[in-house]
């Protein structure tokens, strides 16, 4: 049974700790010294570390953490021929951790992300805030101008339909970052010294029908609700594109959440993004994507999932066919990606045979 977190000075428990219901997934190519900073918040949880790059390299993990570590040899051994759907030499490999997890919730973070401080100077427990976000409803069908109406001190404003005040199940909690912003390469080149210093104390639901650029470095989700759609695509080694892995997953996830009446939140919590990646290397990875996204985004804005697609898997398989048909004319890469999306679902179902992700809502 999960424990609880009690607010100092309060006799009432606030957020369930979900100690036995949540895995932390970390993709890495280096020693995980950054975990020392997170020890107070992460040590109670199980970690799934996905080692990218050279599988003969030893990744050092600080003592005292409960973890399992998978390298490329492990991925090939577990998935066999289906391992082709897991990216190599790209942080997109993290989605393998989502697949092998057996927990209800996932939190994923990059190894260059440190504990941030709120305006009062207090360390931010990012994981606790993500749990709060996931365990409270979302409001995707009607925008509340006070943002999160379920937060203490807030409510639904005048004119908000009473029939919608129960909200929807929350599938995704998308956190933000202080210091180094998550910019594309052209923006990095124009603003090399820009830092995000604005702390906005808010969580909001992204409205139904609105897409967003999902970032995977501070992200939590309900694996039971949306896990099979959290595929980070084919990126990195041998592929014509990179740095679109989390955004691709986010577009797929948002379209499916809209169809299944699930919610996606963004805002708190913040982490401290410690270092900027090389904008020239990034430009090479992103170059094709910068042009392709002008077709990709309208594709997701206009795709309509049939009503008989009532599970995440069915929705995702339908999307894969549409990707091949509608985006395959742009570049053969999208035909390959559509096939990989099917392979991903097949691999997911093989490793998770008794828990297919079904909608708690109903298809719209």
Curated annotation (Swiss-Prot):
SUPFAM superfamilies reported for this sequence: Nucleotide-diphospho-sugar transferases
GO biological process, one term: cellulose biosynthetic process
GO molecular function, one term: UDP-arabinopyranose mutase activity
Cofactor(s) annotated in UniProt: Mn(2+); Mg(2+)
Record-marked site positions (Required for activity): 158, 165
PTM note: Reversibly glycosylated by UDP-glucose, UDP-xylose and UDP-galactose.
Subcellular location, principal: secreted
Keyword Signal attributed: no
Name of the featured protein: Probable UDP-arabinopyranose mutase 1
Taxonomic placement: Eukaryota, Viridiplantae, Streptophyta, Embryophyta, Tracheophyta
